[in-house]
Every structure is written in structure tokens, then in C-alpha cells.
Amino acid sequence: MSQKILFATGNKGKARELKEAFKTAGVDVEIITNSDLDNPPHPIESGRTFEANAKIKAHELADYSKLPTIADDSGLMVDALNGEPGVRSARYAGEAHNDAKNNAKLLANLGGIPDEKRTAKFWTTIVVSMPGEFEKDLVVSGTCSGRILAAPRGDDGFGYDPLFFVPKKDKTFAQMTTDEKNEISHRGNVVRELLKVLPALA
């Protein structure tokens, strides 16, 4: 029987990518998400770093579910904007945010900045927590470098994917298949790092 693990997210795009990454790596686990739980908590991401926010989510959901729990916090860091939007990536446009509004704000803030200075990277930190054993948390991080286009390209993906161009693939994340994206993405990279330090799942 596959080991059951909770991925502490309500983001279907993130969940799909993680499941595909584990499948590609040949890891036999059953990954469930917040939507599979009865009235799950909604942690407040009040941390100032990706690791802090991931731990907040992992600890609260592990306590609630009594399952081994994976949580991630990810963000886009744009060099010309001094690392913004960073930990505020999902809420960049304010309380009434959505992907379109976040992307529009990013493009507005990069107005007039030439292509060669629109460099950026995606960053993901994953925390794995066991209920009642938070002192044993596993923490791994992964990145992917690229640049921000002046207009979106592609119909797949989520978040900033249509604007994040990866030169070595000559595509945005939104133009890639899930397998292509997992091969090079921050989340794909962090899952590979996770498997190196998590032999129980490998």
C-alpha cells in the first residue's frame, strides 16, 4: 500500500506538478491535498521568508491531519525590483489578487526596463513535517532562472508562468508541458533534492 502524504495546499496547479514529479521519480506515494480533508485550517502565512511560511503551513496541517505533511512556499524574485514580489508573490496585487492582477502589476512595475535587465528566478522551499516531531523537519530549496517578458505567452501553467521565459528552452513555463516544466523548474528541482534526503519515500 502506498504511503499517504498530505501536500498542504489548495493550489491545484502546484498539486498536479508535485504528483507528476513524484511519479516521474518512481516514488510510490498517495498524495492528498487540503481539499481532501474535512474543514481544514487555513494557515496565515505571516513569515518573512519562504522557509518560515512553509513551516507555518506544514506544522498546522500536520497537527490537524496527523499525516506526514509536505508544504511549500514559492515566489518570483525579480532582480530589477530588488527581489520583489518575493514572499508576497501570490498576493502581489493586494487583497483582491488573482493571477491576472498579479501579472498586470508585475508588468507595470517593469515598464521601461529593457529585456536584458528583466532577469528573475523562481524559488521554492519545501518543508516535510511529521506530526509531533517538528524538530525533525526536513527543509530543501530549489530555483530556476529566467527573465520576465513584456507580454504573456502560452496557455498552460498558473501564476506568473506566462511571463517567465527560460532561455535554454526558448519557452515560457506556460508554453511547456508538465514534464518539460518539471525537468527544469524550481519545483521539479526541489523535489529531486527532497528525494535525496527522504529515503523513506524513494
UniProtKB/Swiss-Prot annotation:
Record Gene3D superfamilies = 3.90.950.10
Could you tell me what the cofactor note in this record states? Binds 1 Mg(2+) ion per subunit.
> What positions does UniProt annotate as the active site of this protein?
73
Task: Name the EC number(s).
Answer: 3.6.1.66
Cofactor(s) annotated in UniProt:
Mg(2+)
Classification via CDD domains: HAM1
Q: Which GO terms describe its biological process?
A: nucleotide metabolic process; purine nucleoside triphosphate catabolic process
Q: Return one GO MF term.
A: dITP diphosphatase activity
What's this chain's function? Pyrophosphatase that catalyzes the hydrolysis of nucleoside triphosphates to their monophosphate derivatives, with a high preference for the non-canonical purine nucleotides XTP (xanthosine triphosphate), dITP (deoxyinosine triphosphate) and ITP. Seems to function as a house-cleaning enzyme that removes non-canonical purine nucleotides from the nucleotide pool, thus preventing their incorporation into DNA/RNA and avoiding chromosomal lesions.
Its family remark reads: Belongs to the HAM1 NTPase family.
Q: How does it assemble?
A: Homodimer.
What is this protein called in UniProt? Answer: dITP/XTP pyrophosphatase
The species this protein belongs to is Lactobacillus acidophilus (strain ATCC 700396 / NCK56 / N2 / NCFM)
